[in-house]
Amino acid sequence: MAGKTLYDKLWEAHEVKRRDDGSSLIYIDRHIIHEVTSPQAFEGLRLANRKPWRIDTNIATPDHNVPTTPERKGGIEAIVDQVSRLQVQTLDENCDEYGIVEFKMNDERQGIVHVISPEQGATLPGMTVVCGDSHTSTHGAFGALAHGIGTSEVEHVLATQCLVAKKMKNMLVRVEGQLPAGVTAKDIVLAVIGKIGTAGGNGHAMEFAGSAIRELSMEGRMTICNMSIEAGARVGLVATDATTVAYVEGRPYAPKGEQWKQAVESWKDLVSDEDAVFDTVVELDASQIKPQVSWGTSPEMVLAVDQRVPDPAAEADLVKRGSIERALKYMGLTANQAITDIKLDRVFIGSCTNSRIEDLRAAAEIAKGRKVAASVKQAIVVPGSGLVKAQAEREGLDKIFLEAGFEWREPGCSMCLAMNPDRLESGEHCASTSNRNFEGRQGAGGRTHLVSPAMAAAAAVAGHFIDVRELIQGSAA
């Protein structure tokens, strides 16, 4: 009998009932709530005269709509947009009514849902974790079965603590070797997406393994699992190991005392068996990965920084040729244009992909002693949570950014998506550490280029894309 994958083990441990149609009822351990996808769910509970089944499994915070500028200290009334203000206010009211723990807008523990849950220890190995946000896959970095859900499913979880789901196939992404200096977890996952495409992981739970993955910090692993959704997979996973345990230990929601010892012992099995069989296997050599930059309107439209934008005339597939032509037109680029010739109007360092302390340190290392180029209209750094912000300030990172000409903001989703005041104007190019570069994602007509924090900082000081390895080598010389 073949061994089991990590996904198999997590699924079986939470399968309440298998149904005749092939679907299963899955128990949910942790439910994370934000202001955008929860109002209708709570209203559904009221209309059905129900209450949350297990209040203690829920944790909430506003993130999508909150302003990241100082005026937010004025409270909810400082949110200018009426819809945004109403959503944040409604979350507060719903959590207060049902006794759900919420880190409100000006609580130091507030931040992006996928940052605050891990840093609180609310995301633990072996859990099932859901949230009304597609990037819930982030939490798979802990060896947890985590994925996004829709608003109706948010209501189902609140009411029953279960979801109906169908088991997915297993995909293994093995990344072996040592990453070159200046190449990060963000570059790994962009390279994976560039290799398999945004549909490559469709219908799969995607486990990341190999020596390069094992060497990553938890922040790096979260970055990779965060963007498994952009690779087509609903679920991203990394096996639990000593790095995972060290990160979780001592956090507020983590087990304590004897329960901690028991938990750590049980987590040892949160790995795929050596003889486990995967439906699909993808392999990458970490030593060959270079800093990545997306050039088009899909995350799969990504290249190494030393490459050139594709020429649609060289593409034989008419559908692909049309996609390239449309992307070039929207992005305002020309065929065969060098990535390093793309000039930037704005730079955004933040989002649930890259706003943790390790990300800010990497960007600050590049920004230190340098200045944002005069041609760059705005460069902002948005910590993923109040706790990340406080840690960065203790380390003096805020001063490095401010002296270089970056804006230092309050935590929130910010410029990742055009649901708050931080957004692009039409035609502007932005080097962004976020996860999506669709048309209009950062604002109507905005042009998004996905990069790592170090690459974003390098672009800010150069005014155009530059190979960050040149700056690192220059600093070492």
UniProtKB/Swiss-Prot annotation:
EC numbers, comma separated: 4.2.1.33
InterPro entries: 3-IsopropMal_deHydase_lsu, Acnase/IPM_dHydase_lsu_aba_1/3, Acoase/IPM_deHydtase_lsu_aba, Aconitase_4Fe-4S_BS, Aconitase_4Fe-4S_dom, IPM_dehydratase_rel_enz, IPMI_cat
Residues in the signal sequence: none
Note accompanying the cofactor annotation: Binds 1 [4Fe-4S] cluster per subunit.
GO molecular function: 3-isopropylmalate dehydratase activity; 4 iron, 4 sulfur cluster binding; metal ion binding
Residue numbers binding [4Fe-4S] cluster: C352, C413, C416
Enzyme class: lyase
Cofactor(s) the protein requires to work: [4Fe-4S] cluster
Pathway annotation from the record: Amino-acid biosynthesis; L-leucine biosynthesis; L-leucine from 3-methyl-2-oxobutanoate: step 2/4
Family in the record: Belongs to the aconitase/IPM isomerase family. LeuC type 1 subfamily.
Quaternary assembly: Heterodimer of LeuC and LeuD.
Entries under NCBIfam families matching the protein: leuC, PRK05478.1, PRK12466.1
Primary role: Catalyzes the isomerization between 2-isopropylmalate and 3-isopropylmalate, via the formation of 2-isopropylmaleate.
Name of the protein in its database record: 3-isopropylmalate dehydratase large subunit
Taxon lineage: Bacteria, Pseudomonadati, Pseudomonadota, Gammaproteobacteria, Pseudomonadales
Gene this chain is encoded by: leuC
